[in-house]
A protein has these predicted regions:
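Tryptophan-paired
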Residues: 81, 86-114
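Short hydrophobic alpha-helix segments
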Residues: 95, 131-132
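Short amphipathic, basic-aromatic surface patches that mediate peripheral association
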Residues: 53, 58-75
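Extracellular beta-sheet/turn segments enriched in Thr/Pro/Gly and aliphatic residues
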Residues: 47-57, 133-159
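Short acidic/polar inter-strand loop motif in beta-rich domains
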Residues: 120-131
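Bacterial Sec-dependent N-terminal signal peptides
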Residues: 9-42
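Bacterial N-terminal signal peptides
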Residues: 2-10
Length: 159
């Protein structure tokens, strides 16, 4: 009898004060950003990758990555979206992606063993996401993924 009473009391305390409204989901809001003008270090200030060599940059190493977003984010891809690589706050590469394709190619410049974070700009929401998985460590003349088997990079929206 005591257990039954506790359950009834807990249900009664969860009800609203005579309010029969259905709770509504409120989408979280995040900081919106204007279109970032990320500059590729190999392109002399241009914001597109030109496939230049690492000799055109002040860095001794470069690597190539083929990247895709997780399935949950692919449905929202647009041709206005951007992807870039960073070491701290410094842009180390800007990705290219053929129109309406899901695979990004990015050449990343820096020094061997530097930790790299990818940033993804989702143009329709004006959100910037940071990569959280996998860990990306720059390796000289290295490669992560291929066009046919790209690395899936999981992202978290910047708040």
């Amino acid at each position: 009898m005591m257990a039954t009473l506790a359950v009834v009391v807990s249900f009664a305390s969860c009800s609203s004060s005579g309010d029969n409204e259905t709770p509504t989901y409120k989408e979280p809001t995040y900081t919106q950003h204007e279109d970032p003008q990320w500059e590729d270090p190999s392109a002399g200030g241009s914001s597109t990758t030109t496939g230049g060599s690492s000799s055109a940059t002040p860095y001794s190493s470069d690597m190539t990555m083929y990247v895709q977003l997780p399935d949950s984010m692919k449905a929202y891809l647009s041709n206005a979206d951007k992807l870039a690589a960073f070491c701290g706050a410094e842009c180390r590469g800007v990705a290219t992606r053929p129109a309406n394709d899901e695979v990004w190619m990015i050449r990343i410049y820096g020094e061997a063993n530097e930790e790299i974070t990818l940033k993804y700009y989702r143009a329709d929401k004006k959100y910037i996401y940071d990569s959280v998985e996998p860990q990306i460590v720059l390796s000289n003349d290295g490669q992560m993924g291929t066009y046919d088997d790209p690395v899936t990079v999981f992202m978290r929206v910047e708040e």
